[in-house]
């Protein structure tokens, strides 16, 4: 018996779709029957991904876009309406991480982090909200375990993800009145290129050596399957990876123990070159 595809005929809009979780989600939503809108800055990556998805039998629209630029996401949403006639799922995934001790960072570093990770999410929501109201669709916000637990040496990133978590908690009941399900995704360590993006948001070919044991890092394809399942079930939040779930559990039930673990891990984590 053929398995029913959970997003058959849906139009799925994904920011940050050129690599990592975003690209894996595009593949997984397409596997589940969706047509995908690939939104990111790197057009060559998007074109290659679109060709892969089209070859597998689904439609893919490429929209080069910078979530920090006013107007880009409105243009992307308009192109989606023209191509697919509707919008069923929106995934606000674009983001990067600013790292460093407080004394080594400036207010501009924090502003840059928020411009992508927070205001980029808001721009995505504003650009697509009316479309989601029409389809009673799904809004997916990419948070992080770092939105539950602050990590020394990553205060801009943690602050931005705490903000996304607050936005999701506020919007979930607010948008439920319009039939829109809001799902917050809180990943732990997932394989991605985030470590190849510097504090200015510029991608570099070589990433710093990873201080994280490989066993704690989930493949993007596995993470994407778990995320799509959570979106299909209209869950309020999904914490991804066993490590991430353990961290959130300890934060709620043994915060003192977790603080000790985080301090030890953060010291090791900050020894890497930048």
Task: State the predicted function of each range.
Residues 64-75, 107:
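The beta1-alpha1 cofactor-binding region of Rossmann-like NAD(H)/NADP(H)-dependent oxidoreductases
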Residues 144:
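Residue(s) in the substrate-gating loop at a strand-loop-helix junction
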């Amino acid at each position: 018996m053929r398995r029913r595809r959970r997003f058959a005929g849906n139009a799925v809009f994904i920011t940050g779709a050129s690599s990592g979780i975003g690209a894996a989600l595009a593949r997984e939503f397409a596997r589940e029957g969706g047509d995908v809108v690939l939104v990111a800055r790197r057009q060559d990556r998007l074109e290659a991904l679109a060709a892969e998805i089209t070859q597998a039998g689904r439609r893919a629209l490429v929209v080069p876009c910078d979530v920090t630029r006013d107007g880009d996401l409105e243009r992307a949403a308009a192109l989606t309406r023209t191509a697919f006639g509707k919008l069923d799922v929106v995934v606000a995934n674009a983001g990067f991480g600013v790292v460093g001790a407080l004394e080594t960072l400036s207010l501009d570093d924090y502003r840059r982090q928020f411009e992508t990770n927070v205001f980029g999410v808001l721009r995505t929501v504003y650009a697509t909200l009316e479309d989601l109201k029409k389809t009673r669709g799904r809004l997916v916000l990419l948070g992080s375990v770092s939105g539950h637990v602050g990590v020394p040496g990553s205060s801009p990133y943690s602050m931005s993800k705490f903000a996304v978590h607050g936005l999701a908690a506020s919007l979930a009941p607010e948008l439920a009145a319009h039939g829109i399900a809001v799902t917050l995704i809180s990943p732990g360590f997932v394989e991605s290129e985030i470590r190849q993006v510097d504090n200015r948001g510029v991608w570099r070919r070589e990433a710093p050596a990873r201080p994280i044991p490989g066993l704690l890092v989930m493949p993007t394809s596995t993470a994407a399957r778990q995320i799509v399942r959570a979106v299909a079930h209209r869950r309020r939040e999904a914490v991804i990876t066993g490590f991430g779930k353990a961290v959130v559990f300890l934060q709620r039930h043994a915060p003192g123990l977790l603080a000790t673990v985080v301090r030890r891990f953060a010291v090791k984590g900050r020894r890497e070159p930048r």
